[in-house]
Amino acid sequence: MSSKQISIVLLIVLSVTACIFSSNNKDEQAIAKKVANILDQMTLAEKVGQMTQIDMRLLDDPSDIKTYHIGSILSGGGAVPESNTPLGWLEMVNGFQKVAMENRLAIPLIYGVDAVHGHNNVLGATVFPHNLALGAANDADLVYRINKATATEVAATGIHWTFSPCITVPQDPRWGRFYEGFGQSTELVNGLTAAAVKGYQAQLSKTNGKQVAACAKHFIGDGATVWGTGTRVDGLHTYYIDRGDVQLDDKTLREMYLPPYETAIAADVKTIMVSFNSVRGEKCHGSKYLLNELLKDALGFKGFVVSDWAGIDEIPGDYKSDVINGVNAGIDMVMVPGIMEGQNQQHYKVFIQYLIEAVNEGSVSMARIDDAVSRILKVKLEIGLFDNPYIDDA
């Protein structure tokens, strides 16, 4: 190839790259403009509602979605529609969405589910091996194809968000959730993370351009807790290692557990879930250093941070201080999720009341609320929810 031909090829490559970069910039600018426009119209109550996630079983009434401007509904373990079929799920999610769209600003719900090895809550869905088995295969293309297939089935049931992939680096096989990770090697987990995220978030056919959002979890150190440091949770039981304390120094924690998150963020993961555990005695759900300074500032994460199931409840202090400390630490959406029999959890209406009070009292700044809601709206726009809030049953 002559120098002239090489120059032409380079010029074409640079032109295409510039076009893609320009297009991406325009998309980002357009979304940012839409977010700002919506945010300017929102009341404090509407903003707090967007930061609230409720389990579908724990809604007092579906009309509360409209009344309290709820931003997200989830199906926790065992939370299934009366007809546990793909059509049953689709009709349930579309029904909740219809109520949300009756709000004056018509901000759609983002519905979440633990589709962690296939769409495993739905009878008849394809079930794949857990991550530990996929880590043993160590085949990034296989992980991508499995997660894209899972996302296809998730989207077909009207759902927009899977609480996966789990990118922990588990060390102690006595931990009951060990199988959720790809393996004990940071290099192995890191090597499969991009494929896992991109598979879930691949553009799908037959969804009118709508995309499923992935959720990297659990930030951070959930596979490194020390045996005997587990948390006692009222209404549940005492854990020996789960929800325990990570006692690694900061350098080791960063070297072992940050690389997969850096990779997930580079792959444009839309959401990240906080871990139940503590790091050197401080609950991750209440750590401004971990969630704000490290995850958002240092790593540059631009999506939104979601708590785990009633995760803020385990921050020391009463529930109102839990709300204040969790949101100020950097949690954008709180999985409340509501009052469940036999568990000591708070009602979503209490969460909403306390967060509104905290803003009015100055304990949580409006800037923090606006940042959280902007991130949530941004993700909803990016995955196409505003354009196509429903999936039809075709």
PLM features per residue range, with description:
Residues 1-28:
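Bacterial Sec-dependent N-terminal signal peptides
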Residues 18-394:
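Glycoside hydrolase catalytic-domain context in secreted enzymes
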